[in-house]
């Protein structure tokens, strides 16, 4: 069996203020590769995750087995979801309920009594309670339909204690956040070796070693641990299982890498997600480690060749403000000369860079006032006539923020070429371009883009024009890029990535 230990620390957020964003995780990427190849795997969950079943559904993850530290401590052994509504709580007889779009506010005699917060699927995440307008406690609900944890707060609205419950409402463990000490309910003394622990990590480690991985077969099983500096469990506790530590740019790992490197006695198995991580590992440990990309290719060719207008995608997430403005200005100079032939979509991940994209467009309008109009700002009939009479070009320039993998697929479907001029290559963007079959213009050399084959390396922003000229309006070069990308798709397919995993798993 393949056991994976992900670094999943965060709980689900209050969606009333959470801005949708795309997230990447090395464990999820490994899991997708296993699932694509129908290779069984188990998850070892070390963090408190009351909404785990919801998370797995959102990620379309179906492990063969889930070994969960807090499920063991709380006596839960199933994944059956159960809906809990606000009516299931015991409210004072004179409670009034104020329903809003995102939560329910409970009032008693005109005073705030409680506030119920929901997730994106309408399930209750938690209930906050108040006394004299002061936040006193929070009840977190498990997606399987029970109160899982109670959080107590001081007068400064800081959490002081976590109390964990089972499905029957009995408390199992109490965690003092100021001292990190843990008390185990004597009613469940057979669950653990001790009733008191100085550190929560000691209890969690005991559960993993004595109850979750106690049947680990060193000859046939494999343990893949995401190395992460935020984990509550010291990574050296896994060394007895001869693990493969997965390191990626998505999780800080330098501190724990130093710890396990000192304790492993030169018998450390590490895995990097890209060349950059490989170089950092080699610099810190001196080890040459294998690389398995996190993102697999998918044969999903775009349809830009069916469009008369060639759309340029400019990805600015990793560019500075000045670089983004320069690149947009450069592409504008192309569009204004042939507005019917080319278009521009500025792409970002974050809300901050989306604002930069809008600023770039506004700067164009300010610097070139009267020289063009945006196609998105549809003029009325009179303005349309005046535009045609004065030959003011209508330019197709827009900005799009990518928040899901599906969204990037929709955006790339109509792109003719993509520019990623950040200091480092964005691997997800890159593998999507390869899967879509479109060329890429990059700032740095990398193993996926071969100069003047499926892209052009552009050391300076002014070089971008040369790369655009090479592929746009030239079907021969574009088709050559497509053929090269199809070959790369085979190299980065789920089957090929699984072959790399099988090589690592051979003992």
Regions found by a protein language model. Name each.
Residues 1-218:
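Long terminal accessory regions outside catalytic cores
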Residues 211-217, 238-242, 247-270:
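Membrane-proximal helix-turn-helix segments that form the acceptor-binding/catalytic region
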Residues 263-289:
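A short, active-site helix/loop in glycosyltransferases that binds the activated sugar's phosphate group
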Residues 294-381:
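Conserved catalytic-core segment of nucleotide-activated headgroup transferases in glycan assembly
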Residues 385-429:
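Donor nucleotide-activated moiety binding/catalytic core segment of transferases
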Residues 414, 418-479:
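Catalytic binding pocket for nucleotide-activated donors in carbohydrate/polymer assembly enzymes
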Residues 477-491:
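A short, well-ordered alpha-helix in the C-terminal region of glycosyltransferases
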Residues 491-507:
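C-terminal alpha-helical cap of glycosyltransferases
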């Amino acid at each position: 069996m393949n056991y994976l230990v992900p670094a999943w620390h965060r709980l689900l957020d209050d969606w009333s203020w959470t801005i949708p964003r795309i997230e990447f995780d090395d464990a999820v990427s490994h899991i997708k590769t296993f699932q694509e190849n129908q290779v069984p795997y188990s998850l070892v969950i070390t963090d408190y995750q009351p909404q785990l079943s919801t998370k797995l559904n959102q990620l379309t993850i179906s492990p063969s087995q889930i070994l969960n530290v807090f499920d063991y401590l709380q006596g839960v052994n199933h994944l059956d979801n159960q809906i809990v509504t606000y009516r299931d709580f015991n409210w004072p007889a004179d409670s009034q309920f104020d329903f809003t779009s995102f939560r329910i506010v409970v009032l008693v005699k005109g005073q705030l009594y409680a506030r119920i917060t929901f997730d994106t699927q309408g399930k209750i995440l938690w209930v906050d309670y108040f006394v004299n307008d002061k936040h006193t406690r929070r009840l977190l609900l498990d997606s399987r339909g029970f109160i899982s944890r109670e959080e107590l707060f001081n007068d400064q609205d800081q959490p002081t204690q976590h109390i964990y419950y089972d499905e029957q409402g009995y408390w199992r463990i109490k965690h003092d956040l100021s001292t990190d000490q843990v008390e185990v309910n004597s009613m469940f003394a057979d669950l653990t070796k001790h009733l008191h622990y100085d550190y929560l990590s000691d209890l969690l480690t005991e559960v993993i070693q004595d109850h979750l991985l106690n049947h680990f077969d060193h000859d046939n099983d494999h343990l893949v641990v995401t190395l992460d500096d935020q984990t509550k469990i010291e990574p050296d506790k896994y060394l007895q299982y001869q693990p493969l530590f997965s390191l990626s740019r998505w999780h800080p790992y330098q501190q724990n890498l130093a710890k396990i490197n000192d304790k492993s006695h030169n018998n450390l198995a590490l895995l990097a997600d890209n060349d950059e991580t490989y170089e950092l590992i080699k610099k810190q440990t001196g080890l040459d480690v294998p690389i398995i990309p996190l993102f697999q290719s998918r044969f999903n060719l775009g349809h830009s060749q069916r469009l008369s207008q060639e759309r340029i995608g400019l990805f600015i997430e990793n560019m500075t403000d000045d670089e983004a403005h320069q690149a947009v200005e450069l592409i504008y100079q192309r569009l204004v000369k042939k507005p019917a032939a080319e278009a521009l979509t500025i792409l970002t991940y974050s809300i901050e860079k989306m604002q930069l994209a809008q600023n770039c467009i506004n700067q164009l309008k300010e610097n070139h006032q009267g020289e063009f109009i945006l196609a998105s700002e549809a003029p009325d009939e009179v303005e349309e006539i005046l535009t045609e009479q004065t030959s003011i070009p209508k330019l197709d320039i827009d900005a799009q923020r990518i928040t899901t993998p599906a969204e990037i697929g929709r955006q790339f479907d109509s792109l003719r070429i993509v520019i990623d001029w950040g200091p480092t290559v964005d691997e997800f963007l890159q593998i999507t371009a390869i899967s879509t079959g479109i060329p890429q213009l990059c700032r740095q050399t990398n193993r996926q883009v071969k100069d003047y084959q499926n892209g052009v390396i552009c050391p300076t922003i002014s070089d971008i024009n040369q790369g655009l000229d090479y592929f746009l309006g030239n079907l021969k070069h574009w088709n050559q890029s497509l053929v090269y990308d199809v070959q790369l798709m085979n190299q980065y397919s789920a089957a090929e990535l699984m072959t790399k995993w099988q090589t690592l798993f051979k003992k």
